[in-house]
């Protein structure tokens, strides 16, 4: 009998049996090519194997095929044979310029530390078989093309159209608050389509340059996105830090409002990027150039203030002029910096800088300090950095030590001003002669005794010794009332007075009744309290003062005094003391009579009910 022919079902079962006993087919993988890299840079080409039999650690061998001999393989390096390299690659393998690095058992990477033009060609990754059957592929090739280094980076000279960089890095001195502007020229002539990224960085003064010491300030990424280093992110967001591209190859960084921490050596780093066949962008070249050594001079180290013309001795009513000079290597006031200047005065022997007399703010607007609003005082800028304070008529109270205070401001983002420095001058003594006015006052209660409801008249006689012609007197009346339950009196309250200009001023009378104050003689004043009441009881005194008027029509107090105490006690009239018992007796009699009448009426009504 003949052998039966296989049926389709049996053939299918046989095929499944064969596939079930053998499911391995070795695959070697390398990146898709061609890969474009730049001479002088490093490259890493990965290789891994899958679907293999045998040990987990596989061996790898790398070969190269040069364009001029595409059929000739040149052994580069192997994971199992240290003598594998051909003579042309031996020195580079020995120096580490060419090496294979194992990532894991079935994956390695070929590393070339510094590409050369003759490294262009096909690279083959081969894996010796450890399989029971020869299935799949045991090698894979990728093309590497080495491009010449066409990347150029240099410092851009000042001016928007500059092209030639200086032979050595410049040294720039920038004042705090000013703009720091640096330019960088970066271009490539590579024939392939590439992108450039440009980054501005700063290294602290005298620090070696490297990735560890170079702090990125701001950079333009390969996708044209602008990003800042972490310490500068806020300044970029506020617009204080800017980066722009001008033309095809010029990049400009502007740091507004330079700070002390901005000092250092600035570099420009340009990187060239190319897109691999797998769609990823890879950096293929990088170069760095020193732009400038920048020194930011802080305003606090430069600001200085001097005053003149020296110690002053003047008489009352004379003008007082003081000059203040602000010096130092300072930026002019304007878009980046502003200044304010003021004068302070402290009485002789008083601690601290004193109180403000007058000042010019950052806008040049003048203002007077507390207590000087009614004075004829001028504060003005008489030269570029010279300021003058003028008091039209000095007073003895103006004597003391004067200091000039200057403040420097820098403008941050927008129009916001930030105080950066301040300086005070040395003290300048000013002496103003006293007028020599001596006042004495004697006050008394006319009549000696006053009763409730009457008018109390208090008189005050003033005597004057010394003083200039035209001296005028003023007098005011004050009362200290005894506080309830206290032995001592409360604070003095103004009752009334007459000023040096003859105008009466009325205060608050304790009893609330009418008050009159008047000048009854050249140096005699009178206070009258009408309708005296018990609330007017207290201790009164007269307080005269001497006033001098200067040519600028301002008044100043040249002297003062205080009289002795005058006790005002409103007595009660004798008839009033008799009238009180009468009222009390009448009241008691009425109450007693009413009580008796009520008792009799009550008893009578009870008897009527019983009947």
From Swiss-Prot:
Q: How does it sit in the membrane?
A: Single-pass membrane protein
Q: In which tissues is it expressed?
A: Expressed in lymphocytes as well as in many tissues with higher expression in brain. Detected in all regions of the brain with weak expression in the pituitary. Expressed selectively by neurons but not by glial cells. Expressed in myoblasts (at protein level).
Membrane-spanning residues where? 578-598
User: In the UniProt record, does the keyword Lipoprotein occur?
Assistant: yes
The record's keywords, sorted A to Z, are:
Cell membrane, Disulfide bond, Glycoprotein, Immunoglobulin domain, Lipoprotein, Membrane, Palmitate, Phosphoprotein, Repeat, Signal, Transmembrane, Transmembrane helix
Q: What happens when the gene is disrupted?
A: Igsf8-deficient female mice show no fertilization defect. Igsf8-deficient eggs retain normal level and localization of CD9, resulting in normal microvilli formation, which indicates that IGSF8 is dispensable in fertility.
Instruction: Using the record's annotation, list all stretches that form the Ig-like C2-type domain.
Output: 26-143, 160-284, 301-422, 429-554
Side of membrane Cytoplasmic, spans: 599-611
Q: Which residues lie on this side of the membrane: Extracellular?
A: 26-577
| An annotated GO BP | modulation of chemical synaptic transmission
Q: Which domain of life is it from?
A: Eukaryota
Cystine links in this protein are: 47-125, 184-268, 324-404, 460-542
Positions where lipid (S-palmitoyl cysteine) attaches: 602-603
Q: Anything noted about its domains?
A: The Ig-like C2-type domains 3 and 4 are required for interaction with CD81.
Q: How does it assemble?
A: Interacts directly with CD82 and CD9/tetraspanin-29. Also interacts with integrin alpha-3/beta-1 and integrin alpha-4/beta-1. Part of a complex composed of CD9, PTGFRN and CD81. Interacts with CD81/tetraspanin-28.
The molecule here is called: Immunoglobulin superfamily member 8
Originating organism: Mus musculus (Mouse)
């Amino acid at each position: 009998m003949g052998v039966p022919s296989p049926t389709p079902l049996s053939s299918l079962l046989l095929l499944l049996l064969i596939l079930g006993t053998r499911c391995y087919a070795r695959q070697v993988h390398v990146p898709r090519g061609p890969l474009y890299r730049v001479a002088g840079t490093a490259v890493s080409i990965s290789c891994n194997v899958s679907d293999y039999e045998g040990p987990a650690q596989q061996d790898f061998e790398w070969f190269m095929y040069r364009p001029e001999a595409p059929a000739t393989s040149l052994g580069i390096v192997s994971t199992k044979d240290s003598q594998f390299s051909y003579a042309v690659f031996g020195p580079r393998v020995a120096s580490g310029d060419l090496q294979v690095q194992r990532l894991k058992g079935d994956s390695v990477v070929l590393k070339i530390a510094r590409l050369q033009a003759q490294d262009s060609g096909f690279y083959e990754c081969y894996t010796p078989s450890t399989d029971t059957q020869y299935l799949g592929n045991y090698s894979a090739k990728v093309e590497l093309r080495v491009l010449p280094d066409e990347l150029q980076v240099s410092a851009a000279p000042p001016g928007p159209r500059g092209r030639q960089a200086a032979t050595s890095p410049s040294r720039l001195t920038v004042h705090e608050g000013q703009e720091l502007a640096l330019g960088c020229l970066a271009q490539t002539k590579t024939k392939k389509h590439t992108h450039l990224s440009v980054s501005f960085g700063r290294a602290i003064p005298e620090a070696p340059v490297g990735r560890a010491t170079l702090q990125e300030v701001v950079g333009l990424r390969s996708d044209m996105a602008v990003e800042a280093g972490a310490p500068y992110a806020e300044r970029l967001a506020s617009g204080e830090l800017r980066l722009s591209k001008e033309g095809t190859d010029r990049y400009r960084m502007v740091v507004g409002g330079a700070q002390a921490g901005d000092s250092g050596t600035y570099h420009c780093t340009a990187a060239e990027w190319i897109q691999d066949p797998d769609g990823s962008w890879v950096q293929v070249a990088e170069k760095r150039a020193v732009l400038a050594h920048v020194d930011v001079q802080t305003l606090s180290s430069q600001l200085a203030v001097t005053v003149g013309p020296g110690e002053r001795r003047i008489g009352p009513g004379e003008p007082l002029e003081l000059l203040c000079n602000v010096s130092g290597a300072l930026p002019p006031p304007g878009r980046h910096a502003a200044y304010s200047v003021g004068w302070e005065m402290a009485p002789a022997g008083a601690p601290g800088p004193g109180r403000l007399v007058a000042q010019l703010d950052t806008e040049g607007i003048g203002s007077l300090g507390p207590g000087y609003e009614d004075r004829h005082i001028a504060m003005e800028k008489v030269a570029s950095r010279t300021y003058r304070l003028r008091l039209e008529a000095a007073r003895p109270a103006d004597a003391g030590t004067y200091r000039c205070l200057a403040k420097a401001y820098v403008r941050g983002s927008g129009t916001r001003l930030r105080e950066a420095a301040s300086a005070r001058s040395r003290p300048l003594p000013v002496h103003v002669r006293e007028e020599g006015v001596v006042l004495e006052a004697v006050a008394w209660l006319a009549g000696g005794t006053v009763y409730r409801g009457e008018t109390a008249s208090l008189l005050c006689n003033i005597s004057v010794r010394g003083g200039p012609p035209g001296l005028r007197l003023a007098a005011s009346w004050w009362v200290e009332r005894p506080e309830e339950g206290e032995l001592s009196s409360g604070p003095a309250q103004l009752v009334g007075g007459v000023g040096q200009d003859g105008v009466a001023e009325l205060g608050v009378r304790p009893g609330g009744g009418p008050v009159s104050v008047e000048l009854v003689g050249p140096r005699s004043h009178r206070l009258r309290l009408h309708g005296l009441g018990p609330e007017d009881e207290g201790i009164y005194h007269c307080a005269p003062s001497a006033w001098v008027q200067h040519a600028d029509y301002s008044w100043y107090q040249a002297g003062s005094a205080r009289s002795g105490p005058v006790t005002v006690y409103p007595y009660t009239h004798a008839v009033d003391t008799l009238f009180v018992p009468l009222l009390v007796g009448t009241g008691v009699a009425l109450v007693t009579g009413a009580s008796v009448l009520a008792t009799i009426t009550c008893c009578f009504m009870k008897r009527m009910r019983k009947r």
